[in-house]
Amino acid sequence: MADDEEIDIEGDDDAPLLFDHKDDALALPDLPGYEPNWMFDHGQEIYGRSWTSISQFVQTRTPLQVKNYARHFFKTKVVQKVEEGEDEDVDIEGEESGEEAVMELRSTCGLNPAQPAVVTSDDTSTGENVMEETEAVTEDHPSLDNLVQDDREMPQQETTGDGEQYPMDEHFLPVFPWQPDDTQNRVIVERIEGSVGLGSVRGDKDVRPVPGVEQNTYGPHTDMFQVQNTLLAFEKQVGADRIFEGPSXSKNEATDTQTEVSETKTEVIERQTESQVDATHMHTYGDGLMGSIERLTESVSSSELKEDLKTGIEYVEKDDATDSSSTAKGYDNYTLDHPEDRSKPDSVVSEKWSCEEAMSSHTDGRTFSDSDSGKETYDLPRYNTTIFQGHSEDETSDAGQAEEETFFTFKKPTEEVVLDRSVITEEEKEVHKEFFDGRQTKTPERYLKIRNHLLDCWERTKPEYLRKTVARAGLRNCGDVNCIGRIHGYLERIGAINFGCEEANRGEFPVAKVGVKRNPQGHGEQLALQAARLESMHVTSDELEKQDGGVSQIRPNRSRAARTNLNSFSYDPFKLVPCKRFSEESPAPFSVKIHATALVTIDMHAHISTAEVIGLLGGVFHRDPGALEVASAEPCNSLSTGMQCEMDPVSQTQASEALSQAGYSVVGWYHSHPTFAPNPSVRDIETQTKFQEWFAQGGSPFIGIIVNPYSSTRISPLSRVTCLTISSEWNPPAIQRVKLLSRYAGHTDTTYMDKMLYSLSGHLCRGNADSDEDGNSESLTLLTDIRDIFANSWTSSLGTTPRSSIASL
């Protein structure tokens, strides 16, 4: 954003709005009556310098746009402070003070769930009452001087563009907790110790009018609103001296706070005398909400709520007895009173409810009970927990999942359990609910197949420990690895498999979450919210053009398949190549006989190291029967790097001398693949080919042996051994010859030969540019000869006549 662009800092009505770009392709239509400047201002008070959160709060701007505007906003704010002569430091970056300001602002405005701010709403309220409210709110937070806010008058009704009213949910009335009133002026003084990150003294110009709501109406996008239960008229009991007194308040702190607040008392009274508060709207709002509470309580099962409340109270009394007792003294003294409606003189009965605040800071809603009967108690829905408690929806859902997760505890088995292969017990149905709830992919038959396969594998490998990765090799299309692992863990805990093994896990067994609702929102709402977030994070080419100041360059999107094909031709020396067995069609050039002593030496050498080992093979080659006899194996030192293995030249010489002294000649080499398949790698094939060429000069064969001692997919404890030799036969290469007589690139009259001759003539013409006609004739003769050579080679096999013209050349 340009530095010289005019930005609405003071809130004038005729100033341009935030990001007021007509041509911006990303600029969505703003909410009716909600100006982005006002949304940014109050979004900053709630979220601090979190531009992503503010952008989601505004809903029509991306985080990058919000960040650019904030940078320009604070830069202009510094210039304004300097021009006014103020020497207070303004925090521009807001790394530390912004976070402190948000915490102070949340706790001061009553956003802390442990200490809510209760505000009275009397018809005869004056500036003194406002000062008492400020004193009660800021009593526990001396870092802020005062916070004076009066939201007791409801603004005008919001309508759509066609003049129709928005429908209102009959259960709650959405109100912003920070909502300013256009019928009154307010003064907000926010001072943070050490800096003024969010602090400023704002009067008429700073506060923008917000479209209000009346009963049965609301503004668009109700998910932006939070229900304020504290906006109800709370009536103080007889004998109470103060509106609200927190459990940790003291008289000295109250006196100091009252002294600081009195400095702005005169200014507040003057501003409030300019516009009187209309209390009728509040009474109307109270009537509607009280009726909604009655309908809500009648529609909910009282027995279930009684049990939930009883459990919650017992939990609070046990875990937080001290805090709950002290807090109850401050909270239980307030009665929610539904006073007589002045607009309806006939109403005589006044409904009274006792407001009981939950003692735990994690309580999601306030609890209301009938003070007269004292029988039924109800919890209001958790509408106001997102902003007040400072927890996100993801944290709330994660906490719910942790609470709902259950475990099965099994006793340590004393003897091996033998299960009937055709019967599924009730315990298995309870533990593995996912296979018995009617799913198409997970059926009881599939569960039996997985369980019986694990039991069969255990019968073959006992008493060795059976790992689930080994058993999974024999299960194809039988479910995901998680469900196989859960069945393996269950059988292990009851003693059906891995009985007597030290590696067996006997701890708690988690139950698969079947039917647990991970997100409290509906599926449609969740998809809509996710789509809105993705849309807000999308950056178009037009926006990039505006940011960079020029035309954006769009790079072509390369397909994943193209990159995969290019990488497939790269040289990988560690790629394993499967071997091809000899058959009757391609018999082995000679037979191999290995002595048991040599095989024991190779296997023992491979077992003592997790890295690759290497050595030489000694034996005799019998030419008449064409048999190679391997009688001895000599281990050698290796130059292993963990990824490859090479033989030490000094050790190789010593091993060759030892085999010669024993009367054997070198007939091969061996090495190990500790944990992967005994297939040769590309590097092994190169080494084997090199050795075969050396020994083939003397007419002797040369073989290679690969041993795999620790196989992760083999159930048997025996090592896997592969004996290989490189065949002299090569597969014919793929046909890549170009058919010169075929059409070139879809042209009807041009062949590949015509294209080749035309290209050659261009080179010859440039070389004979300064020559005479004799040079041109020689070039034409050369092209004719080239055409005849290629044409004859193709026509001899196809029996056709080439159709190629050189007249134009």
Curated annotation (Swiss-Prot):
GO terms for cellular component: nucleus. Residues 335-345, 363-378 have a biased composition (Basic and acidic residues). SMART domains: JAB_MPN (SM00232). Residues 592-719 form the MPN domain. It comes from the Eukaryota. One of its GO terms (biological process) is chromatin remodeling. Residues 113-140, 320-378 are annotated as: Disordered. Its EC number is 3.4.19.-. Residues 410-508 form the SWIRM domain. A motif (JAMM motif) lies at residues 671-684. Its main location: nucleus. Keywords: Activator, Chromatin regulator, DNA-binding, Hydrolase, Metal-binding, Metalloprotease, Nucleus, Protease, Transcription, Transcription regulation, Ubl conjugation pathway, Zinc. One of its GO terms (molecular function) is histone H2A deubiquitinase activity. Zn(2+) binds at H671, H673, D684. It is found in: Nucleus. InterPro entries: Homeodomain-like_sf (IPR009057), JAMM/MPN+_dom (IPR000555), JAMM_MPN+_peptidase_M67A (IPR050242), MPN (IPR037518), Myb_dom (IPR017930), SANT/Myb (IPR001005), SANT_dom (IPR017884), SWIRM (IPR007526). Residues 33-78 form the SANT domain. Belongs to the peptidase M67A family. MYSM1 subfamily. Metalloprotease that specifically deubiquitinates monoubiquitinated histone H2A, a specific tag for epigenetic transcriptional repression, thereby acting as a coactivator. Preferentially deubiquitinates monoubiquitinated H2A in hyperacetylated nucleosomes. Deubiquitination of histone H2A leads to facilitate the phosphorylation and dissociation of histone H1 from the nucleosome. Acts as a coactivator by participating in the initiation and elongation steps of androgen receptor (AR)-induced gene activation. Binds double-stranded DNA via the SANT domain. The SWIRM domain does not bind double-stranded DNA. This is Histone H2A deubiquitinase MYSM1. It comes from Branchiostoma floridae. The gene is MYSM1.
